[in-house]
């Protein structure tokens, strides 16, 4: 644990505003212009950002992989129509929409509500990239023998998608995990 509060200024004797690292006062990275501990603020910000980024990644993967698997499995007109909708949605400028929507939210709305709203808006405009990759992986997996065997045994389309195809395309999601976390962090940083 960090010995200082990230919000409260520390006015201990010998600690000045904008001080360099002071080990005797446990200010390992010093203090900022308001006398707050920089290390405490970094750790607190990192914790919040990682929770936000992992929530973002989970929601993007859920939405993008579900839509991509359904498009890849059904193919034909479902795939063609779905792909056109995804292409149109992907061309909406993501960062501008986030900035516009967040600026319209009234200031009396609580901080947690604003963070959840930002998360939902970012997910709504970011799931399309995962859809393309999951669609391609589903096309590849759909041609394998276990899908044919499941169809012959009477499994329905949703059972095949969620019980057979989705678990076998997890490698695609694992590959994109660090990149999606980095996108979430850099997008929130760009809003600052």
Predicted segments, located by residue:
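Juxtamembrane "helix exit" motif at the C-terminal ends of alpha-helical transmembrane segments
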Residues: 2, 105-106
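Small-residue (primarily alanine) positions within well-ordered alpha-helices
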Residues: 71-72, 149
């Amino acid at each position: 644990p960090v010995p200082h509060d990230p919000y409260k200024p520390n006015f201990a004797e010998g600690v000045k505003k904008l001080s360099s690292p002071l080990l005797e006062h446990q200010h390992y990275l010093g203090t900022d212009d308001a006398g707050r501990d920089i290390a405490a603020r970094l750790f607190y910000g990192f914790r919040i950002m990682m929770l936000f980024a992992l929530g973002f990644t989970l929601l993007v993967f859920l939405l993008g992989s579900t839509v991509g698997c359904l498009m890849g499995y059904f193919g034909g007109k479902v795939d063609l129509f779905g792909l056109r909708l995804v292409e149109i949605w992907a061309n909406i400028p993501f960062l501008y929409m986030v900035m516009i929507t967040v600026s319209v939210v009234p200031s009396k709305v609580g901080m947690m509500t604003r963070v959840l709203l930002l998360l939902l808006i970012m997910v709504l405009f970011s799931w399309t990239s995962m859809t393309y990759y999951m669609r391609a992986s589903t096309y590849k997996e759909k041609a394998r023998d276990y899908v044919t065997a499941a169809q012959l045994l009477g499994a329905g389309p949703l059972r095949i998608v969620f019980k057979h195809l989705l678990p076998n395309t997890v490698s695609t999601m694992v590959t994109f995990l660090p990149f999606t976390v980095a996108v979430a962090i850099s997008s929130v940083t760009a809003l600052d």
